[in-house]
């Protein structure tokens, strides 16, 4: 009997404190790999609870399958990606953004960033800044395609081990 394809729906919602350990592991594995682990569970939990931050998750919604025998790699409510942004009076800072490798190329990162940017606009923020590894050409390209520009080169930014670019996007029209 042939296996039918799955239908996967994604919903965005605020991160739950109970998800902090998983988000921290995602940060370690997909953002901080090769560096000292900075964004551990306690730090993520703090950002989730911080009134000046938004921690957003992309989760799977109810999965519909035509063939009940088919194995699926996702369960309802699985976290597939997350983004965390802090908000100041004029500037927001994208702290972390990651999507599980098996869930990439589904516009999850774009949807997370759209939501966080809209929240920044609603809050009256005029600019978003972020840092990205200098060697992460895929992420740098993603952000450039989204209207961010490389503002500063930060030599040794990551614990003296790796350099970064500070990128920024102006939200107000000139």
Predicted regions and their residues:
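Acetyl-CoA-dependent GNAT
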Residues: 2-8, 14-104, 110-119, 123, ...
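C-terminal "cap" of GNAT-fold acetyltransferases
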Residues: 3-8, 55-57, 126-129, 133-140, ...
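Intrinsically disordered, low-complexity N-terminal regions enriched in serine/proline/glycine
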Residues: 29, 73, 86, 142, ...
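Short, P/G- and charge-enriched loop/turn segments at secondary-structure junctions
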Residues: 43-45, 152-155
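Residue-level detector of beta-propeller blades
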Residues: 79, 150-153
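Conserved glycine-rich acetyl-CoA-binding loop
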Residues: 100-114, 121-123, 127, 133-141, ...
């Amino acid at each position: 009997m042939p296996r039918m394809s799955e239908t996967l729906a994604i919903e965005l919602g605020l991160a739950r404190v109970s998800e902090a350990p998983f988000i921290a592991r995602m940060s370690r594995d997909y953002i901080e790999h090769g560096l000292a682990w900075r964004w551990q569970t306690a730090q993520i939990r703090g950002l989730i609870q911080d009134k000046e931050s938004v921690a957003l998750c992309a989760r799977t919604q109810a999965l519909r399958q035509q063939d009940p025998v088919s194995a699926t790699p996702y369960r309802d409510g699985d976290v597939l990606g997350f983004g965390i942004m802090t908000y100041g009076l004029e500037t927001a800072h994208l702290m972390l953004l990651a999507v599980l490798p098996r869930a990439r190329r589904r516009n999850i990162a774009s949807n997370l960033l759209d939501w966080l940017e809209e929240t920044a606009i609603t809050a009256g923020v005029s600019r978003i800044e972020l840092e990205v590894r200098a060697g992460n050409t895929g992420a740098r390209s993603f952000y450039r395609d989204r209207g961010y520009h490389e503002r500063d080169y930060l030599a040794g930014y990551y614990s003296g081990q790796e350099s970064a670019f500070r990128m920024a996007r102006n939200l107000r029209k000139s």
